């Protein structure tokens, strides 16, 4: 099996930091929006946790994970569209 492409974990952290520090501050006067942002944060934390479990299962199954930084990165190389 070839490498399993997955988002680099930093992507989750960057989005979570933005939501927690900036978005929550921007919606501080609106409890409905605060709730929605909180739910989004919970969902992203679950997604990050699920990806971590998937990576652990891959490691146990000898499947290599290829953390991707963007759609244009593959195997440590930048792929430019033709």
Swiss-Prot record:
InterPro entries in UniProt: DUF5340
Superkingdom of the organism of origin: Bacteria
Species in which this protein is naturally found: Anabaena cylindrica
Name of the featured protein: Uncharacterized 9.3 kDa protein in soluble hydrogenase 5'region
Pfam families in the record: DUF5340
Organism lineage: Bacteria, Bacillati, Cyanobacteriota, Cyanophyceae, Nostocales
């Amino acid at each position: 099996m070839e490498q399993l492409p997955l988002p680099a974990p930093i992507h989750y952290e960057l989005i979570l930091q933005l939501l927690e520090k900036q978005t929550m501050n921007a919606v501080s006067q609106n409890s409905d929006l605060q709730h929605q942002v909180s739910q989004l944060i919970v969902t992203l934390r679950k997604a990050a946790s699920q990806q971590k479990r998937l990576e652990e299962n891959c490691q146990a199954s000898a499947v290599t994970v290829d953390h991707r930084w963007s759609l244009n990165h593959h195997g440590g190389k930048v792929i430019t569209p033709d």
